[in-house]
């Protein structure tokens, strides 16, 4: 196996693993949103756990904390701002929508990633991969059923989140030449901590609390001390964002963004699984059609990429220039 093929396969595995782990984050925050907690409190506790994991991995790897030093502070500030916007809009939308609906709506992000990777990064995206992404997005449309009233303020927030999420991955790809996955993840967690503490100082006493059921209720709730029974969810969010974030950053910094993006569709079946197991919700027939289109598109993209690589190697092999 060539170095390029090995790197691509590793990137795909990181993306799949990161998507599965990050699905636990959606599950836990969805549960916490129904338990009276404020979003900025959840993000703060999650970030403390996540940054502890990142620092622990750095210490265990023996690479030293010098790898957290950066010559690109402004790029990190811009990327952290985008990630923060993506998180806030997504989780506010998630608090108001069924888990599977929110995740399905968020899957416009891979389409944005593919578009940006071609236009901004200049990566080659063949017509078959474009077609596969289009089929996947058709599945998202089937899942969200806009004619049935799914397109609402909460769904618009998730769409905004998807655009910001795709933009953050373009930044990850550009910064990956000089910044490690550890560094990228560390500065995101620091940003979460700073913004959440600031937000808590302004709104944590509840004087900006919104009416129950309003769009911004989750964001402006007052802080309160979690009982032991709820700590599993806070720990799950921290572990998910720490481990899953590292895996996803590693995938995007080492592999073409257009190849990685379809494998984030693993979050869809995971959302179905968690929704059925924890919240007692299960997809109907229409939803299953959407899932088939989405997953089928991702698998087809993997197959097309494998065929393309084999052809490239067959052409290059006679000259030894691989």
Regions found by a protein language model. Give the residues of each.
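C-terminal-most transmembrane helix of multi-pass membrane proteins
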Residues: 269-322
């Amino acid at each position: 196996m060539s170095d390029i093929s090995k790197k691509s396969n590793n990137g795909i595995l990181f993306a799949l693993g990161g998507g599965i782990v990050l699905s636990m984050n959606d599950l836990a925050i969805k549960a916490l949103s129904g338990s009276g907690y404020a979003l900025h409190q959840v993000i703060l506790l999650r970030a403390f756990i996540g940054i502890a994991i990142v620092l622990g991995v750095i210490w265990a790897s023996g690479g030293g904390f010098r790898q957290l030093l950066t010559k690109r502070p402004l790029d990190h500030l811009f990327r952290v701002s985008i990630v923060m916007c993506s998180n806030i809009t997504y989780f506010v939308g998630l608090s108001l929508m069924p888990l599977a609906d929110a995740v399905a709506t968020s899957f416009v992000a891979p389409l944005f990633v593919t578009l940006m990777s071609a236009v901004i990064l200049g990566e080659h995206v063949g017509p078959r991969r474009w077609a596969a992404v289009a089929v996947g997005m058709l599945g998202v449309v089937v899942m969200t059923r806009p004619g049935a009233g799914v397109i609402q303020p909460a769904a618009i927030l998730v769409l905004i989140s998807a655009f910001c999420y795709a933009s953050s991955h373009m930044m990850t790809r550009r910064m990956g030449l000089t910044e490690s996955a550890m560094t990228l993840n560390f500065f995101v967690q620091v940003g979460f901590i700073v913004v959440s503490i600031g937000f808590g100082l302004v709104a944590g006493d509840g004087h900006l609390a919104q009416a129950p059921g309003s769009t911004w209720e989750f964001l402006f709730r007052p802080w309160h001390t979690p009982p032991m029974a709820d700590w599993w969810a806070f720990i799950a969010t921290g572990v998910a964002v720490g481990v899953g974030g590292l895996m996803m950053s590693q995938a995007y910094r080492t592999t073409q963004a257009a190849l990685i993006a379809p494998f984030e569709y693993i979050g869809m079946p995971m959302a179905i699984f968690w929704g059925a197991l924890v919240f007692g919700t299960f997809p109907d027939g229409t939803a299953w059609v959407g899932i088939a289109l989405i997953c089928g598109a991702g698998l087809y993209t993997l197959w097309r990429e494998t065929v393309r690589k084999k052809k490239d190697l067959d052409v290059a092999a006679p000259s030894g220039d691989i």
